Swiss-Prot record:
It holds the Pfam family Urease_beta. Transmembrane segments: none annotated. The gene is ureB. It is found in: Cytoplasm. Keywords: Cytoplasm, Hydrolase. This is Urease subunit beta. GO terms for cellular component: urease complex. InterPro entries: Urease_beta-like, Urease_betasu_sf, Urease_subunit. It comes from Enterobacter sp. (strain 638). The keyword Hydrolase applies. Heterotrimer of UreA (gamma), UreB (beta) and UreC (alpha) subunits. Three heterotrimers associate to form the active enzyme.
C-alpha cells in the first residue's frame, strides 16, 4: 500500500438500508446558491429553500456522509430524505428544535 492510497471495493455501496425515507420538492427562492450537507436537519435549512417544511422534521438528506446538495437560485429539484437515527434529539443548526423530536409520521 502507498501512503494516502485508497483501496476501494468495486460495486455499489448501499446506504441507510431499511431506514424510513421520503421525497420532497425543494425550490431555492433566494438570489444565491444554497448548499445543504448530508447530516443537516433538513427542517432547519435556509428559509430561502421553499418546501413542506413540517413534513421534513426529523429528516436529513439521504446521501453519503460528507457530501452535500447544492440548490442554485431559482432551481427546483426533488430530494430524498432519511429519518434521523438514534435517540432522535436535535440540537444546534438554527435552534428550531433543540431537544427531542416530535415526529408526526404518516
Amino acid at each position: 500500500m502507498i501512503p494516502g492510497e485508497y483501496q476501494i471495493k468495486s460495486g455499489q455501496i448501499a446506504i441507510n438500508t431499511g431506514r424510513e425515507t421520503k421525497s420532497t420538492i425543494v425550490e431555492n427562492h433566494g438570489d444565491r446558491p444554497i448548499q445543504v450537507g448530508s447530516h443537516y436537519h433538513f427542517y432547519e435549512v435556509n428559509p430561502a429553500l421553499k418546501f413542506d417544511r413540517e413534513a421534513t422534521k426529523g429528516y436529513r438528506l439521504n446521501i453519503p456522509a460528507g457530501t452535500a446538495v447544492r440548490f442554485e437560485p431559482g432551481q427546483k429539484r426533488e430530494v430524498t430524505l432519511v429519518l434521523v437515527a438514534g435517540a432522535q434529539r436535535i440540537f444546534g443548526f438554527r435552534g428550531d428544535v433543540m431537544g427531542d423530536l416530535e415526529i408526526k409520521n404518516g
